[in-house]
């Protein structure tokens, strides 16, 4: 049977992969957005695990709020990415400095 520890270890691994993805690849905006989404997924996984094992539905409610914010963040991030690609023909983070006025 799976215990709370199994879920917390899995969430910690997901979080570590996302932090590693952010630190190792700082040039590509798409990968940065995916790593941030993976980080939010790990947090949601913790909320669901604690909610299940403590028999409290508050964690599941928080997950819905976090998913809503993550969807809005993804939509705004991808819209900014499309505008950046149209203007600069690149999605590198280093090219953002040329947009300063």
From Swiss-Prot:
Any one biological process term the GO annotation gives: ATP synthesis coupled electron transport
Membrane topology, from the record: Multi-pass membrane protein
Classification via InterPro entries: NADH_UbQ_OxRdtase_chain4L/K (IPR001133), NUOK/Mnh_C1-like (IPR039428)
GO MF annotation terms: NADH:ubiquinone reductase (non-electrogenic) activity; quinone binding
Cellular localization per UniProt: Cell inner membrane
Transmembrane portions of the chain: 4-24, 30-50, 61-81
Domain of life: Bacteria
Enzyme class, broadest EC rank: translocase
Keywords: Cell inner membrane, Cell membrane, Membrane, NAD, Quinone, Translocase, Transmembrane, Transmembrane helix, Transport, Ubiquinone
Gene Ontology CC entries for this record: NADH dehydrogenase complex; plasma membrane
Self-association and partners: NDH-1 is composed of 14 different subunits. Subunits NuoA, H, J, K, L, M, N constitute the membrane sector of the complex.
Reported function: NDH-1 shuttles electrons from NADH, via FMN and iron-sulfur (Fe-S) centers, to quinones in the respiratory chain. The immediate electron acceptor for the enzyme in this species is believed to be ubiquinone. Couples the redox reaction to proton translocation (for every two electrons transferred, four hydrogen ions are translocated across the cytoplasmic membrane), and thus conserves the redox energy in a proton gradient.
Record-given protein name: NADH-quinone oxidoreductase subunit K
Origin species: Chromobacterium violaceum (strain ATCC 12472 / DSM 30191 / JCM 1249 / CCUG 213 / NBRC 12614 / NCIMB 9131 / NCTC 9757 / MK)
């Amino acid at each position: 049977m799976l215990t709370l520890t199994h879920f917390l270890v899995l969430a910690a691994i997901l979080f570590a992969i996302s932090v590693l993805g952010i630190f190792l690849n700082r040039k590509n905006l798409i990968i940065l957005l995916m790593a941030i989404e993976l980080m939010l997924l790990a947090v949601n996984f913790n909320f669901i695990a604690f909610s299940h094992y403590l028999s409290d539905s508050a964690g599941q409610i928080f997950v819905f709020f976090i998913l809503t914010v993550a969807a809005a963040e993804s939509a705004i991030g991808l819209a900014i990415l499309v505008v950046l690609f149209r203007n600069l023909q690149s999605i590198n983070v280093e090219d953002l400095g040329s947009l300063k006025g």
